[in-house]
Design a protein with these regions (language model features):
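Membrane-interface capping segments at transmembrane-helix boundaries
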Residues: 123-135
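Internal alpha-helical transmembrane segments of multi-pass membrane proteins
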Residues: 68-81
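Short, intrinsically disordered terminal tails adjacent to the first/last structured region
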Residues: 1, 135-139
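Interfacial helix-loop-helix junctions of multi-pass membrane proteins
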Residues: 35-43, 87-115
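"…centered on the first transmembrane helix and the immediately adjacent amphipathic helix/loop
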Residues: 1-63, 79
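Residue-level signature of the transmembrane alpha-helical core
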Residues: 19, 51, 55, 80-88, ...
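Short helix-capping/hinge motifs at transmembrane helix termini and TM-loop junctions
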Residues: 30-32, 66, 98, 125
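Membrane-interfacial alpha-helical segments at the cytosolic side of multi-pass membrane proteins
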Residues: 53-68, 114-125
């Protein structure tokens, strides 16, 4: 029985925050009126938007994977590969949604945001693990 349908295993619910972020990214990627276009005062506002969106997506995926008790390897694979693949897919799809266009530098910004998000999560995960190990060794 698939994971999402197993009555005894409801781990997929842990990924609802990631799904909501994914819906937001999809919406922002396909709308005609791009909010970042009006932010002409900020250099590379569009790229910053991509980095922040995918940083949040990677953090959510990693955090959701942790709550779902995924293995560390699977957690990092999902948190890295899913945003990278989805970011590339969205850039390709934008070609078919004028006035949007496919810009591979946007995908690079997605990848940078993903890398920063995963790195931040790794620092948090290492810190939390060391804190847990210290408290268990003191008992």
């Amino acid at each position: 029985m698939p994971l999402c349908c197993a009555s005894s295993n409801k781990r997929w619910w842990h990924f609802v925050p990631s799904l909501l972020v994914l819906i937001g990214i999809t919406y922002m990627s396909l709308i005609k009126d791009v909010p970042f276009a009006v932010m002409g005062d900020i250099p590379l506002a569009d790229k910053w938007g991509h980095m922040v969106a995918y940083l949040v997506f990677a953090l959510c995926l990693a955090g959701d994977g942790l709550r779902a008790r995924m293995s560390v390897r699977a957690l990092y694979m999902v948190a890295i590969l899913l945003p990278l693949i989805y970011g590339g897919l969205m850039e390709w799809i934008q070609y078919y949604f004028p006035p949007r266009m496919c810009e591979w530098l946007d995908w690079v910004a997605d990848a940078i945001g993903t890398a920063i998000g995963v790195a931040l999560f790794a620092v948090y995960h290492i810190w939390k693990s060391s804190k847990t190990n210290q408290s268990s060794s003191q008992q």
